[in-house]
A protein has these predicted regions:
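Active-site-adjacent loop/helix surface patches within enzyme catalytic domains
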Residues: 2-26, 34, 41-139
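Conserved small/polar residues in nucleotide/adenosyl-binding loops
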Residues: 140-144
Length: 144
C-alpha cells in the first residue's frame, strides 16, 4: 500500500462519525494492508440497539446488566461498525490503531491492529448478513 495522504484525516465521508476514546497511534511507518471483519451483536443475537455503540465509546453499563459482566472494564473499538440497515459508523480514524484484533497474527506478522482496519458487522455469525451490509462493505473497502 502507498503512504496515506496527510491531507486526509482518516475519517470517511458519508458515515456516522462517533469518535471512540479507545485507540492510539499506529507504529511509525505502519501501513494498512489488512481488513479484519468481525461480527458483533449486543445483547447477543439482538440487532438495532445502541449497546455496540456504547461498548466502542466506553459507555456500556456493564455493572447493571448481568449479560455484560464479561465486558466490564473492556476497552475495545473498531474503525467501522456496519449495521444491518447498511448504516456505517466510524469510531477511529483509519490513520490510527483501533483495538479490535487483540493478540493476533496474519501471514507471520503479529499485532494485526498495527496494520489493519477493523470492520464489525452487526450479526451473530449464524444469521445471514443483509445485502445492505455487503454493499456498505464493498463501498468502503474497494479501492477508489
Amino acid at each position: 500500500m502507498t503512504s496515506p495522504d496527510r491531507a486526509f484525516d482518516g475519517w470517511l465521508p458519508g458515515v456516522v462519525r462517533r469518535p471512540s476514546p479507545h485507540f492510539n497511534e499506529r507504529p511509525e511507518g505502519a501501513l494498512v494492508s489488512l481488513a479484519v471483519l468481525h461480527f458483533i451483536s449486543l445483547p447477543a443475537g439482538r440487532f438495532g440497539g445502541e449497546d455496540v455503540d456504547a461498548l466502542f465509546m466506553g459507555t456500556l453499563d456493564a455493572m447493571n446488566r448481568p449479560e455484560y459482566e464479561s465486558l466490564r472494564g473492556l476497552r475495545v473499538s473498531s474503525h467501522f461498525f456496519v449495521r444491518r440497515t447498511g448504516e456505517v459508523r466510524q469510531y477511529v480514524s483509519v490513520l490510527d490503531r483501533a483495538w479490535h484484533a487483540g493478540v493476533s497474527s496474519f501471514e507471520g506478522h503479529t499485532g494485526c491492529n498495527d496494520f489493519s482496519v477493523g470492520i464489525e458487522l452487526e450479526g451473530t455469525g449464524e444469521t445471514p448478513y443483509e445485502d445492505a451490509q455487503y454493499l456498505a462493505c464493498l463501498l468502503y473497502t474497494s479501492p477508489s
